[in-house]
Regions:
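Hydrophobic packing and interface segments
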Residues: 1-247
Length: 247
């Protein structure tokens, strides 16, 4: 049973999650590259088309390298509390995000892409939307905040109350992410199009580049998410070996 539990953790929480996020990662890059080529198709400027195609690839590639820097910046002590551990992980993610913002402005400046400053701002919008979604998820799922505490208290009156409260809380928890995504789409469209609704090509390119920005920190976030199953596997191995409670 312990082995099956460990295998299930690896399949669902590492392989499954990794494949899902990898698909989103590659999909955003390829879609943005196609939108970049289409955005400049009427100008017959093949050089600018090429720059628009490789820009999301360069941002994603640099994001991987900067995520590695963020991972190595995570430092903890042996007797660290849960709050200290979460703070250290948050520091690594935030550091990667800041470095990616700086790298994005540098990359698009070197490419001299049309409207490169506002396109860079669209990447920042994507990163901010990702942060908002992450914070919202933490707020609605962490035991440190009121929603889960209130849900736990509802269990005192019976399982039916927990089910009803849980479904309601789950529905409510989608509001902030949905609003953040809608605002991000509108903002990135306006920024990349130069606040011109008729410039649909550049607006759609801005939405795509914002999605690339949102996923540019995937390296460190995926590593953080995979830590849970790995730690659980270690606990399972210790249990099978009959090791003491201190392990």
């Amino acid at each position: 049973a312990t082995i099956a539990d460990n295998v299930g953790d690896n399949v669902g929480d590492v392989a499954g999650m990794g494949a899902d996020l990898y698909e989103s990662y590659c999909g955003s890059i390829l879609a943005t590259a196609a939108l970049g080529a289409a955005a400049f198709i009427h100008s017959a400027d093949t050089v600018m088309q090429f720059k628009a195609v490789i820009a999301p690839m360069l941002i994603a590639a640099v994001g991987i390298l900067l995520s590695i820097i963020g991972i190595f910046s995570v430092r903890t002590k042996e007797n660290a509390t849960v709050k200290d551990l979460l703070g250290s992980l948050a520091f690594g993610t935030n550091l990667s995000s800041v470095l990616i913002v700086a790298a994005t402005f540098l990359i698009l400046w070197l490419l001299q892409l049309d409207n490169w400053i506002w396109i860079s701002c669209a990447v920042v919008v994507g990163l901010l939307v990702g942060i908002v979604i992450g914070r919202s998820t933490e707020y609605y799922t962490s035991q440190s905040y009121r929603p889960t505490q209130k849900l736990s208290e509802s269990g005192k009156t019976g399982p039916a109350t927990v089910i009803i409260s849980g479904i309601g809380l789950g529905m409510l928890s989608t509001a902030i992410p949905v609003i953040a995504v809608v605002v991000g789409i509108i903002a990135s469209f306006l920024l990349a199009s130069g606040f011109d609704f008729s410039n649909v090509g550049m607006g759609l390119y801005g939405i795509g580049i914002a999605a690339v920005g949102m996923l540019s920190t995937l390296g460190i976030t995926l590593a953080t998410d995979a830590y849970g199953p790995i730690a659980d596997n270690a606990g399972g191995n210790a249990e099978m070996a009959g090791l003491g409670a201190e392990v």
